[in-house]
Regions:
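Bacterial N-terminal signal peptides that target proteins for export
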Residues: 1-10
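Bacterial N-terminal signal peptides
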Residues: 9-18
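Short hydrophobic "helix-edge" motifs at membrane interfaces and signal-peptide entry regions
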Residues: 9-10, 36-38, 269-271
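Boundary at the C-terminal end of the N-terminal hydrophobic targeting segment
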Residues: 20-25
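Short secondary-structure boundary/capping elements
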Residues: 27, 54, 255-259
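Structured, acidic catalytic/metal-binding patches in enzyme active sites
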Residues: 29-247, 251
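A cross-kingdom marker for long, charged
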Residues: 245-312
Length: 312
């Protein structure tokens, strides 16, 4: 199960990565839906939180949705992501507080695999300012996150180029107000809330997946660029939903359900103000996704995609 893929398409984190040069390609086919009631519209845009330079410019459909939106909504308010307070909260949640090293809770085989990974990725760790020995200070979930993020950076994916960062900057430049569907503290709690068994599984799978990550992650990135909802669902959700139903519900379903009333408030607001909502692609896909949940509530929902063969 590709938990790393879920991070790229679902959860934000405090990340650092080194961008690479890439050839310009056709604009990505957008994961963009328009949800309407009698007077207002909400545009839902599925983000890939780490992208490449060649993923820009975006499609004209996305540019038009941004231009027509009076405000933007993200998973976390952009101003909070950049705050030192959120970094401090992440550090406090991630640090081990009982004075024991990480290895004390790892099975010997997993500890050995982590050591081997550290040796092979020392340069990547140095780039984010985290020497290998410092990992012993943290909880397994955070080290799993570090493993995944270092590997993504080595594969050329950059959080500073993700759709969230891009549109946060564009909104600021054009004076459009921004807000969030949840707080940074809530996102940290989703990660830190994994029980010990889930944390060890997450760390182990992060290490395993890093051995063969380039091909797998490139397939997922290509699916996002192609706007292929079926390939994205298969890559990000199918195995997770089957193997870790509690974690899937915690990371995806519960958050989607919590977001629905906030999105509906935008639709119910007086006037004719449109909103662009930018969230991880996973949250918009499948029967558990925000798109189908809003459709089930009776809203008019259509996919906005000039490059798609159908409007579904």
């Amino acid at each position: 199960m590709q938990l790393r893929n879920v991070l790229a398409g679902s959860c934000l984190a405090l990340l650092l990565a080194a961008p690479i040069r890439a050839a310009r390609a056709d604009p990505p086919v957008p994961l963009l839906w328009k949800v309407s009631d009698a007077d207002n519209s909400v545009y839902l845009l599925g983000s890939f939180h780490l992208l490449k330079p060649g993923d820009y410019p975006l499609s004209k459909d996305v540019d038009a949705a941004f231009a027509g939106a009076e405000s933007l909504v993200f998973e976390i308010p952009p101003q909070e992501i950049a705050s030192p307070e959120l970094a401090m909260q992440m550090s406090q949640a991630a640090l081990r507080t009982d004075g024991t090293p990480l290895d004390s809770v790892l099975p010997p085989e997993l500890a050995a695999r982590l050591k081997a990974w550290e040796t092979g990725h020392a340069a990547g760790l140095q780039k984010i300012g985290l020497p290998a020995q410092a990992l012993q200070m943290f909880q397994p979930w955070f080290v799993g996150l570090v493993v995944s993020m270092v590997q993504m950076a080595e594969d050329g994916l950059d959080p500073k180029l993700g759709l969230d960062q891009h549109f946060a900057g564009e909104a600021t430049a054009r004076g459009k107000p921004t807000s969030g569907l949840e707080t940074g503290a809530q996102q940290i709690a989703f990660l830190a809330g994994m029980d010990q068994a889930e944390q060890l599984q997450f760390l182990g799978e992060s290490i395993d997946e890093s051995q063969d990550s380039s091909r797998e992650l490139e397939k997922l990135h290509a699916a996002w660029r192609a706007g292929d909802i079926h390939a994205l669902w298969d890559g990000m959700a199918v195995d997770m939903k089957r193997q870790y139903p509690k974690l899937y519900a915690h990371i995806n379903v519960e958050r989607n359900d919590a977001w629905l009333p906030k999105i509906e408030q935008r639709l119910a607001a007086p006037g004719h103000d449109d909103t662009l909502v930018v969230v991880g692609a996973l949250h918009l896909l499948g029967s558990d996704g925000v798109v189908e949940k809003l459709r089930a509530k009776g809203y008019t929902v259509e996919r906005i995609c000039s490059a798609c063969r159908t409007g579904k």
